């Protein structure tokens, strides 16, 4: 309960060396308190490393869109999304990205922000965790 209550307040997160740590913090902020960010790895066809086929549900679509967003950041903007740090704030149940528009930092932050908010608004279906990707994807 204390964790849930603390997430309702505002939190400033300083830039970190690895974007994936920042993305993890965004996910923690938006998902239900009874879940951990680790439950969102190996979920569906796209949540986790790689991805193929058709997303199995809305949550998996969040990961599909995030993968494509990272792909666009790499190809169109020559960014490295997995290591690009950025400035952001978690406040009032939303996420604000602060870096200048068009910069790699802002592009990657927007990818992560969109995915984290999508996770928070999507149903988690336990049967889609660790699915047989060869069969269902």
Curated annotation (Swiss-Prot):
Binding site for Ca(2+): 46, 48, 50, 67
GO cellular component: extracellular region
Gene Ontology MF terms: calcium ion binding; calcium-dependent phospholipase A2 activity; phospholipid binding; toxin activity
PANTHER family: PHOSPHOLIPASE A2, PHOSPHOLIPASE A2 FAMILY MEMBER
Pfam families cross-referenced by the UniProt entry: Phospholip_A2_1
InterPro entries named in the record: PLipase_A2 (IPR001211), PLipase_A2_Asp_AS (IPR033112), PLipase_A2_dom (IPR016090), PLipase_A2_dom_sf (IPR036444), PLipase_A2_His_AS (IPR033113)
Signal peptide per UniProt: 1-10
Protein name (Swiss-Prot/TrEMBL): Basic phospholipase A2 beta-bungarotoxin A-AL4 chain
Places the protein is found: Secreted
Keywords from the UniProt entry: Calcium, Disulfide bond, Hydrolase, Lipid degradation, Lipid metabolism, Metal-binding, Neurotoxin, Presynaptic neurotoxin, Secreted, Signal, Toxin
Chemical reaction(s) catalysed: a 1,2-diacyl-sn-glycero-3-phosphocholine + H2O = a 1-acyl-sn-glycero-3-phosphocholine + a fatty acid + H(+)
Subunit text: Heterodimer; disulfide-linked. The A chains have phospholipase A2 activity and the B chains show homology with the basic protease inhibitors.
Keyword Mitochondrion listed: no
Function: Snake venom phospholipase A2 (PLA2) that inhibits neuromuscular transmission by blocking acetylcholine release from the nerve termini. PLA2 catalyzes the calcium-dependent hydrolysis of the 2-acyl groups in 3-sn-phosphoglycerides.
Bound cofactor: record note: Binds 1 Ca(2+) ion.
Required cofactor(s): Ca(2+)
Cell membrane among keywords: no
């Amino acid at each position: 309960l204390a964790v849930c209550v603390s997430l309702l307040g505002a939190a400033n997160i300083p830039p970190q060396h690895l974007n994936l740590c920042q993305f993890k913090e965004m996910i923690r902020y938006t998902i239900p308190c009874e879940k951990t960010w680790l439950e969102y790895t190996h979920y569906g066809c796209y949540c986790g490393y790689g991805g193929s086929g058709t997303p199995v549900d809305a949550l998996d679509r969040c990961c599909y869109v995030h993968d494509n967003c990272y792909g666009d950041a790499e190809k169109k903007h020559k960014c490295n999304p997995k290591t690009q740090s950025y400035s952001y704030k978690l406040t009032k149940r939303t996420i604000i990205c602060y870096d200048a528009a068009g910069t790699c930092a802002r592009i990657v932050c927007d990818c992560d922000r969109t995915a984290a908010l999508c996770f928070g608004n999507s149903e988690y279906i336990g049967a889609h965790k660790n699915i047989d990707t060869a069969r269902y994807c």
